């Protein structure tokens, strides 16, 4: 029995924040079953990973893509378990072309100006004979690179595709490893006007009611779509990236220890979809925004999470991945996922201007700006505005 390591290796997001006025013409599309299934899976996986304390960041689209390629080579009950766990459509005969179509849509205009989005796949052959039809399928539908190599070749591919942000993904490979399936997402988004560094000040971030850390907090005042839900005790803010194709969605509980109170917003795909729709139709309001400057790095062995979600046979010697090599001698030994997120003031050349505003006395002023003070734990998503695909999601509990 040979094995193969499924390395869902890297989801990198170098997100450089700045302010941009959102447009009111966000393009809407009919949500397809693949997007809905991917969102449902993202929230299931989040529920598994969130049990650990601390910060959390991962790319559900990266995980779904890599396992989508693996699913294409699964057969019988192994395939059924993968389909159910990943929330793929019950009729998955068109899954590969649907993934191709969705990825192409996500990449459309993805590298225009200061926005960069790369989604890349690969199959590294270490010792196995792989079916030509499987390799052809990966090339045709996932635009996968196919090459032979060892752990050094794999790590070099990782370093190249992530622009050096992740120098390695694996320390070693078992001599029984047959092949490694790879997926990487690299994202760099900036805004037209960055946060001014002069307005970044060290201030408390409250980890709990009794504990806090002093961290750099960025500040700006601008118009953004904002929802204040007093009944469920949270605020949600949508920060569009330049080009208005991708957005950063923040969900901030009113209470410092209130992350559980916003659970209903992310308990299933329908509830999250409803919130995203509300955000995209919410009128822009003047917002005084305070956001921590931070960097997140995550490294997950996802096998335990998938087993808890009901996927078992794929990790056993009885697994059926005969669609990959024509035999029943492959099983998954490892699912490794790394993710990096950077948020700071940089991302574009900045210009400065000074305005001296002379006001007449007794002029009726507009309403004061709303406050969005992200000085305690919050949830966040990086999503595509048109398809509502979740590229990245996470939880910030300590930016220090």
PLM regions: where:
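Detector for small/aliphatic-rich hydrophobic stretches
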Residues: 1-12, 16-148, 385, 396
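Proline-rich low-complexity regions
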Residues: 5, 60, 253-256, 290-292, ...
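A generic structural signal for residues located within well-ordered alpha-helices
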Residues: 37, 61, 176-177, 374
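Non-catalytic, conformational "gating/processing" segments within enzyme and secreted inhibitor domains
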Residues: 53, 92-262, 275-364
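Well-ordered, non-membrane alpha-helical segments in soluble/globular domains
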Residues: 269-272
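C-terminal soluble interaction/assembly domains
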Residues: 334-400
């Amino acid at each position: 029995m040979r094995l193969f390591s499924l390395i869902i290796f890297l989801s990198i997001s170098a997100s450089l924040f700045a302010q941009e006025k959102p447009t009111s013409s966000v393009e809407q599309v009919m949500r397809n079953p693949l997007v809905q299934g991917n969102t449902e899976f993202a929230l299931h996986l989040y529920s598994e990973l969130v049990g650990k304390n601390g910060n959390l960041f991962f790319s559900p689209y990266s995980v779904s893509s890599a396992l989508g390629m693996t699913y294409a080579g699964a057969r019988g009950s192994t395939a059924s378990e993968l389909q159910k766990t990943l929330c793929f459509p019950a009729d998955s005969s068109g899954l590969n072309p649907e993934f191709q179509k969705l990825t192409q849509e996500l990449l459309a205009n993805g590298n225009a100006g200061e926005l960069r989005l790369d989604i890349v796949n690969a199959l590294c052959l270490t010792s196995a004979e792989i079916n030509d039809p499987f390799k052809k399928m990966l090339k045709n539908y996932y635009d996968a690179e196919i090459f032979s190599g060892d752990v050094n070749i794999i790590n070099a591919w990782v370093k190249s595709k992530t622009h050096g942000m992740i120098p390695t993904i694996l320390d070693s490979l078992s001599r029984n490893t047959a092949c490694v399936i790879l997926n990487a997402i690299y994202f760099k988004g900036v805004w037209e006007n960055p946060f001014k560094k002069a307005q970044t000040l060290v201030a408390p971030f409250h980890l709990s009611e009794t504990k806090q850390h002093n961290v750099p907090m960025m500040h700006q005042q601008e118009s953004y779509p904002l929802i204040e839900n007093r009944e469920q005790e949270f605020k949600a803010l949508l920060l569009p990236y330049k080009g208005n194709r991708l957005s950063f969605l923040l969900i901030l509980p009113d209470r410092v220890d209130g992350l559980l109170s916003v659970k209903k917003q992310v308990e299933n795909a329908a509830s999250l979809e409803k919130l995203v729709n509300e955000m995209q139709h919410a009128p822009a309001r003047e917002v005084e925004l305070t956001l921590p400057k931070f960097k997140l790095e995550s490294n997950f062995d996802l096998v335990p999470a998938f087993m808890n979600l009901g996927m078992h046979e794929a990790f056993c010697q009885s697994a059926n991945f005969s669609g990959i090599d024509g035999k029943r001698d492959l099983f998954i030994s490892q699912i490794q996922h790394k993710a990096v997120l950077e948020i700071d003031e940089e991302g574009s050349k900045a210009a400065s201007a000074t305005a001296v505003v002379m006001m007449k006395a007794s002029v009726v002023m507009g309403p004061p700006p709303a406050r969005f003070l992200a000085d305690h734990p919050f949830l966040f998503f990086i999503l595509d505005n048109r398809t509502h695909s979740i590229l990245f999601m996470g939880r910030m509990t300590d930016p220090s």
